[in-house]
Structure formats: C-alpha cells, structure tokens
Regions:
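A short beta-strand-turn-helix
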Residues: 2-20
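Short pre-active-site segment immediately N-terminal to redox-active cysteine/selenocysteine motifs
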Residues: 19, 25-29, 70
Length: 104
C-alpha cells in the first residue's frame, strides 16, 4: 500500500489500463492525514491493488511532480493520467464512488 520509490509509483500509475488507482498523498505530521488513514485502509481492503499512499516527506520528487501543496490530497489515476483530485478529508463513500466510476 505504501509507495516507496519513484520507479514503483510510475509502474503503478502507468499500469492502470484496465483499472483506476487511488493515491493518497500524506505526511505523518499532518493531523487530517492521520484522520484519513482508517478510510484509506478500509478502501485498500475493498479495492485490493487499487489504493496506495505516498509520504510526501519521503517522496518529495513525486509530490513536486504533481504539484502537491496541501495534504491530504487524494488523486485518482487512470492510464497514467490524473482523472480527479480530492483535497482534504472526505467520507469513504466519496472515494469509493470515484474509484468505481473511473474503473469502468
């Protein structure tokens, strides 16, 4: 669930031809990010191999590449492209519906 290298990140977002993936950009010092963690964990169980996390402190290059300025920031990728960005903490149903929508 945690993305630890740029190579891993690129592999995941570019291997989405038949599926969308949700990436949570977060940091351990961010209170709202910690509040979102149980939701992301639950989503990863509902959508195996479709939900990932990027620690922006550890993966600054990825965060800069996608213009992450505020966290939590959740992006839905498909075919290597950002389909949608959700800022802040949302209900689990919002993330679930977006992931289902872009997976079709």
């Amino acid at each position: 669930m945690d993305i630890t290298t740029t190579k891993q990140f690129d592999s995941i977002i570019n291997d989405t031809e038949k599926k969308a993936v949700l990436i949570d950009f977060w940091a351990p010092w961010c209170g709202p990010c910690r509040m979102l963690t149980p939701t992301i964990t639950s989503l990863s169980k509902t959508f195996p191999n479709k939900v990932y996390k990027v620690n922006v402190d550890m993966q600054k290059e990825i965060a800069m590449r996608f213009g992450i300025r505020g966290i939590p920031s959740v992006k839905i990728f498909k075919n290597g492209d950002v389909m949608e960005t959700l800022q802040g903490v949302q209900p689990e149903s919002v993330y679930s519906e977006k992931l289902k929508y872009y997976s079709n």
